[in-house]
Amino acid sequence: RTLVIARSGYSKQGGFEIYVEGSDIGMDLWNTLMEAGRPYDVWAGCPNLIERIEGGLLSYGNDMTIQNTPHECGLGKFCNTQTAIGCIGRDALLRVAKEGPVKQIRALEIEGGPVGPCDQLWPVMVKGKQVGAVSSAAWSPDFKTNVAIGMVRMTHWDAGTDVDVMTKDGVRAARVHEKFWI
């Protein structure tokens, strides 16, 4: 039987994902692993939203979409546009690689008590003008602040820039953070 074990996931927990070929061995494998791991406090995990945001792990469809370029998402270093002959959008990617994006993913720290769920884009504002949007946010018990991922225009993406975030519970003061927390 083929098994694939991947050290991957959306947290700093250092877990593994196991993929089996065929479902008939899944339950037996599960029970065997849980029993063998019990003395070592091994258990099943799940994605951790807070750690995902603290670490700047982007969620496709939420923090980045097909509408974003790799450069906007901080992934430009993985694009080899010089050899991408025939690639649709190559010219645009070459231009952005040379000139830089006009907006980019940034870490944001939102002031105040815990924010509610970010179930829609929250506008990022400066003096009444929208300069970006928060796509993921959560209270971080480790850092005692609200951590967020947002797409911010280059005019306001420098670390320390003060902005306002229009949460569903009202306006919150925020600032662009130097980097993600973990």
Write out the residue ranges for each language-model feature.
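Conserved, structured C-terminal
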Residues: 1-182
